[in-house]
């Protein structure tokens, strides 16, 4: 009995370890073939996932050299720096005063990020426009991003989320419509960004549509390890009867299933 009761726990662990081993093999192959992509990032057990992402992004940029790959490397470098700062308790700007392999890795990552930031300031890639607007407060990048509204260039969930964020205060109903459209762009098996779900719940709360705020809070709970918006907490602000709650819970379950199947349709 003991053996069989442990199998559900052991099998996911075995699968996880297998995936980690495969990823390690891929990174090892990249570093063997192109040592320069890895040499400046110390492999000391800290920030291992972020380090692997940077190496992989460097490799893809080396192979294809597109602006999208430049953005992905910039994003991964930023995450690596954030992790390294946390693990060393050293801010990047102060790191030049200290010497250690991990600090050297921070300096190398920061230097490459600064270089890519400068190189891409004229790019019209929507992700890079967002980067330069949010990181450099570049009004021209914001204007160029907004000019792409309604075009195929923004037909991705992450970009619709960003667009909805722009209109959240000035045109909340438009922001809500954009969030629903973002969800409709997911295919079967895609990882749903829970920020879209929490944004919908928050937007509906702002419109005093408490039933929908509760419903989307409930949906968000299925896509987060630690829910940012709790349907239980939302219930504190607005009393929801038992029958209504059951109906909303069922509607939320239907939405969750549609999102997982990639069949969600905006209302």
Regions found by a protein language model. Name each.
Residues 1-11:
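Bacterial N-terminal signal peptides that target proteins for export
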Residues 18-21:
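C-terminal motif of bacterial Sec signal peptides marking the signal peptidase cleavage site
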Residues 25-127:
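N-terminal Sec/ER secretory leader and immediately downstream segment
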Residues 116-119, 148-152, 182-185, 189, ...:
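Alpha-helical solenoid scaffolds that mediate protein-protein interactions
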Residues 125-206:
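Alpha-helical adaptor scaffolds
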Residues 174-175, 212, 247:
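Alpha-helical positions within canonical tetratricopeptide repeat
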Residues 208-226, 250-258:
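TPR/TPR-like (Sel1-like) alpha-helical repeat modules
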Residues 229-267:
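Terminal, low-structured helical/coil segments at or just beyond the last alpha-helical repeat
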């Amino acid at each position: 009995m003991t053996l069989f009761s442990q199998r559900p726990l052991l099998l996911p662990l075995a699968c996880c370890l297998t995936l980690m081993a495969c990823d390690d093999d891929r990174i090892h192959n990249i570093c063997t073939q192109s040592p320069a992509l890895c040499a400046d990032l110390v492999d000391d057990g800290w920030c291992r996932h972020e380090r692997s992402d940077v190496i992989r992004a460097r490799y893809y940029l080396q192979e294809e050299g597109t602006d999208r790959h430049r953005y992905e490397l910039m994003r991964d470098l930023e995450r690596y720096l954030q992790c390294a700062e946390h693990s060393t308790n050293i801010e990047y700007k102060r790191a030049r005063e200290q010497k250690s392999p991990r600090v050297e890795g921070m300096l190398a990552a920061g230097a490459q990020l600064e270089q890519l930031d400068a190189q891409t300031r004229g790019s019209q890639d929507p992700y890079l426009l967002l980067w330069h607007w949010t990181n450099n407060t570049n009004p021209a990048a914001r204007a160029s991003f907004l000019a792409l509204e309604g075009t195929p260039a923004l037909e991705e969930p992450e970009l619709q989320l960003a667009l909805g964020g722009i209109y959240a205060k000035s045109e909340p109903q438009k922001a809500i419509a954009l969030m629903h459209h973002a969800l409709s762009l997911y295919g079967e098996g895609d990882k749903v960004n829970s920020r879209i779900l929490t944004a919908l719940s928050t937007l509906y709360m702002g419109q005093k549509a408490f039933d929908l705020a509760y419903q989307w809070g409930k949906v968000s709970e299925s896509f987060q390890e630690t829910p940012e918006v709790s349907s239980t907490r939302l219930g504190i602000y607005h009393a929801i009867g038992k029958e209504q709650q059951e109906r909303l819970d069922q509607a939320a379950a239907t939405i969750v299933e549609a999102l997982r199947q990639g069949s969600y349709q905006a209302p």
